[in-house]
Regions:
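Sec-dependent N-terminal signal peptides
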Residues: 4-13
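Right-handed parallel beta-helix/beta-solenoid
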Residues: 18-49, 65-67, 91
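Beta-strand repeat architectures
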Residues: 51-59, 79-81
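Surface-exposed loop/turn segments connecting beta-strands in extracellular beta-rich domains
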Residues: 71-72, 91-96, 101, 119-125, ...
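Extracellular beta-strand/beta-solenoid scaffold signature
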Residues: 74-76, 99-107, 127-136, 152-161, ...
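Surface-exposed loop/turn motifs in large extracellular/passenger domains
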Residues: 80-87, 107-117, 135-146, 162-169, ...
Length: 288
């Protein structure tokens, strides 16, 4: 595309966005602005500045690329639309890194039409104090997670609980505890509808040291779902440090679900605990 034409389209998009009341919030840890208002010219210096903002449909949170931002982003109760989603993404050169220490990094709770893309989230480690999930989505719908890297979480790299209509694509989840990617819902139901997981890699999600009565250390796990597709994904090197000899884990699998499709995937070199009696590469488990 002609560079001048591209810039013209970009400028028109920005002007149109402001005309429609869309707000942009910028975070840059290198900001030296004396009066940070979250604008591109005077960005917030830390993620803490986002805590007092009541987010609206169409808002965009821009995180400065090629730097580490410490803290969390928590978005709750935002009912955005497909035309005006709330977006969390990087800007500038490179990808932004969120270090959330012992907590989850990005939490989306009771929301609709939220997009998270082009960010890296990192916790303190599955055995070093973290108890959270990298991208944690709770009872939310029409969620898109794209080109995310998540590591260092005791629970999941990306975790979906309840809700539905979720797409997870082109993401790399590694060195987490419970699972690389998990989708789950209310026990005894198949109430989480329309899940798509594609072109993702789950590697070295070794096991959760806090779970001593069930499996942990799977690559991709889907449960309590109706209508889900997992395709063009790879799971490898997971499960080797599950802290018990019982069931699981598995590279890519599902349970208690209807209309689950796993296709064009590669699951290899996954393991169970040294005394483990179960596990596998792929599995349609109980309730399928």
């Amino acid at each position: 595309m002609n560079k001048l034409l591209f810039l013209s389209i970009l400028l028109l998009t920005c002007v149109t966005g402001w005309a429609n009341g869309i707000r942009n919030f910028y975070v840059d840890s290198f900001s030296d602005s004396q009066v940070a208002d979250g604008s591109m010219e005077s960005p917030f210096k830390s993620l803490d500045a986002l805590k007092g903002i009541k987010f609206l449909p169409g808002d965009c949170i821009h995180l400065a690329g090629n730097q580490i931002l410490t803290g969390i982003i928590h978005v709750k109760g935002v009912k955005a639309t497909s035309e005006n989603p709330l977006t969390i993404t990087s800007y500038g050169t490179g990808v932004s890194h969120i270090y959330s220490a012992h907590s989850s990094a990005i939490v989306i709770d009771a929301c609709e039409n939220i997009h998270v893309k082009n960010v890296v989230v990192k916790g303190s480690g599955r055995k070093k104090g973290n108890t959270g999930t990298g991208i944690e989505v709770i009872n939310s719908r029409f969620i898109e997670v794209d080109r995310v890297e998540a590591s260092g979480y005791q629970m999941n790299g990306i975790g979906i609980t309840g809700g539905g209509d979720v797409r997870i694509t082109h993401s790399y989840v590694h060195d987490n505890g419970y699972n690389g990617i998990e989708v789950t819902g209310k026990w005894g139901t198949k109430s989480v509808h329309n899940i798509y997981i594609g072109h993702c890699v789950a590697e070295n999600n070794a096991g959760n040291p806090a779970i001593l009565d069930n499996h942990s250390g799977s690559g991709i796990l889907v449960g309590h779902v109706t209508n889900a597709t997992i395709e063009y994904c790879e799971a490898m090197g997971n499960g080797w440090d599950m802290p018990r000899p019982g069931n699981g884990p598995v590279g890519i699998w599902g349970y208690e679900s209807d209309r689950l499709t796993i296709q064009y995937c590669f699951s290899h070199d996954n393991k169970t605990s040294p005394e483990g009696l179960d596990g596998g590469g792929f599995d349609f488990d109980g309730g399928i």
